[in-house]
Swiss-Prot record:
InterPro entries: aa-tRNA-synth_II/BPL/LPL (IPR045864), Gly-tRNA-synth_heterodimer (IPR006194), Gly-tRNA_ligase_asu (IPR002310). It holds the Pfam family tRNA-synt_2e. Keywords: Aminoacyl-tRNA synthetase, ATP-binding, Cytoplasm, Ligase, Nucleotide-binding, Protein biosynthesis. The gene is glyQ. This is Glycine--tRNA ligase alpha subunit. It is found in: Cytoplasm. Belongs to the class-II aminoacyl-tRNA synthetase family. One of its GO terms (biological process) is glycyl-tRNA aminoacylation. It catalyses: tRNA(Gly) + glycine + ATP = glycyl-tRNA(Gly) + AMP + diphosphate. The lineage of its organism: Bacteria, Pseudomonadati, Pseudomonadota, Alphaproteobacteria, Rickettsiales. The keyword Aminoacyl-tRNA synthetase applies.
């Protein structure tokens, strides 16, 4: 079987979950640290209304900046997120079938579910979870979402997060993300991952670790915090959640710069968690 390109992996997963019955959503247009932060997960996992969606989410983690020199760690990467609410009884079987669609033979390869309960302190979210390893390399995270914004999820949603770069490294049999086949084309049309993203990776790493203005980021954090509180009072939880995301990203940038002490870090986490909680609480009040 021909090895899938990076974009073919995405298209295959989209088609698989669309055939299952998921709505295929688009990435959220905000700086987020993971696909979980998309409001399609944070807000829609709350309440009783069924919700089945899948989407790609570009994600940013300033603390993982490596100037494009690390084989598989970047400050910008892609996740494929699936949310099934309520979680079906056969969710693990559905996941394994999706791997087969990507050309991974389950009879040959060692697929293991390694217990790893998931928690996001800034979102006030947690759930029973497993890392999914393929021949010793983590390729996905599997979680029963039990709490978001400090609110219990009833019913529990099933969350599957595919690490697209790691999955592609395994499928294509290469050692470095920059060498991944992005497009599946040959000749002049051939395109590698590094040609798409790695110039930006180097520049954003320099910004994240050397040039970001900490005083400006502190102001941005406080401004977003204040704006979030104001929007909640105006019964506008969705734009308020955008401000929560801005505060979260500013915190991540400050953390990457190394200007926040351990004590201060705990305080900032609690402040972002408070914003997430009031957004979730208000959204749930308005969508019962």
């Amino acid at each position: 079987m021909k090895k899938l390109s990076f974009q073919q992996i995405i298209l295959t997963l989209q088609n698989y979950w669309q055939d299952y019955g998921c709505a295929i959503l688009q990435p959220y247009d905000a700086h987020v640290g993971a696909g979980t932060f998309h409001p399609a997960t944070v807000l829609r996992c709350l309440g009783t209304k069924p919700w089945s969606v899948a989407y790609v989410q570009p994600s940013r983690r300033p603390g993982d900046s490596r100037y494009g020199m690390h084989p598989n760690r970047m400050q910008h990467y892609y996740q494929f997120q699936v949310i099934l609410k309520p979680s079906p009884d056969n969710i693990q079987e559905l996941y394994l079938k999706s791997l087969e669609c990507l050309g991974i033979d389950l009879k040959i390869h060692d697929i293991r579910f390694v217990e790893d309960d998931w928690e996001s302190p800034t979102l006030g979210a947690a759930g029973l979870g497993w890392e999914v390893w393929c021949n010793g390399m983590e390729v996905s995270q599997f979680t029963y979402m039990q709490q978001i914004g400090g609110i219990e999820c009833r019913p529990v949603a099933g969350e599957i997060t595919y690490g697209l770069e790691r999955l592609a490294l395994y499928i294509q049999g290469v050692d470095e993300v920059r060498e991944l086949d992005w497009s599946g084309q040959v000749g002049e049309k051939a395109l590698k991952y590094g040609e798409v993203d790695f110039e930006a990776e180097g520049q954003f790493s320099k910004y994240n670790l050397e040039l970001a203005d900490s005083e400006m980021l502190l102001r941005h954090f406080k401004d977003s915090e204040d704006q979030c509180e104001r929007l909640i009072k105006a019964n506008l939880p969705m734009p308020a959640y955008d401000e929560c995301l801005k505060a979260s990203h500013a915190f991540n940038q400050l953390n990457a710069l190394g200007v926040i002490s351990v004590t201060e870090r705990a305080s900032y986490v609690l402040r972002v968690r408070h914003l997430a909680r009031i957004c979730c609480t208000k959204w749930l009040e308005m969508n019962k």
